[in-house]
Amino acid sequence: MLILDKPAGLPVHRGPRGGASLEDWLPALALGKHRLPQPAHRLDTDTAGCLVLGRTRPMLAELGALFAAGRAAKTYWAVVRGAPPRPSGTVDAPLLKRSTAKEGWWMAVDPAGQPARTTWRVLGKAAGLTWLELRPKTGRTHQIRVHCAHLGCPILGDARYGGGEGRLHLLARAIALPLDPPRGATAPPPPHMRDALAACGWA
């Protein structure tokens, strides 16, 4: 298996319009194996940080089972606009995919949606901004982004969910996998997040 620090803006899979993607790098990451490594989970194009790949079919299946069962411990950092109502808490809000011809698709909090749960805590603050640590307990699409918006503090740069223009300030900070032996990694903040994090107290 491999754990990569995926750059923000690089899609994991090549889209219908082509362009650069992580797939371009998979042959170099094969490291002598005939089978190309494959992602074991999703990571949004605009999110930087830890991405796990399986190099063999058995390992990919084992990793997939860990993620499906919620046993892979994922930690995210985000810089959000505004502040949550208290120092820590849990968002338990189901998510449903919606779409229109004009606006495309997005995820919304809806009682008819799939269960989604995220714990969070405040790590630091600045004028109009808050640095959050978030731990998703489920793996829904756009879960952290929608849950932050649901808290009333959308992620900085998240135009889709109310965080304004600019680059998305969301980092897949760490991953811990209960393998034998255990495996894990921590990713540094990408350059575009460092000023906002420093303003909130990161050093």
Model-derived features with residue positions:
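Beta-rich strand-turn-strand
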Residues: 138-141, 189
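Phosphate/ribose-recognition catalytic cores of enzymes acting on nucleotide-derived substrates
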Residues: 148-188
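RNA pseudouridine synthases
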Residues: 1-106, 111-117, 124-126, 169, ...
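Short histidine-centered loop motifs in beta-beta connectors
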Residues: 127-135
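Loop/turn elements at beta-strand to alpha-helix junctions within RNA-recognition modules
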Residues: 57, 137-138
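Short beta-strand segments enriched for Tyr within beta-sheet-rich domains
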Residues: 140-148
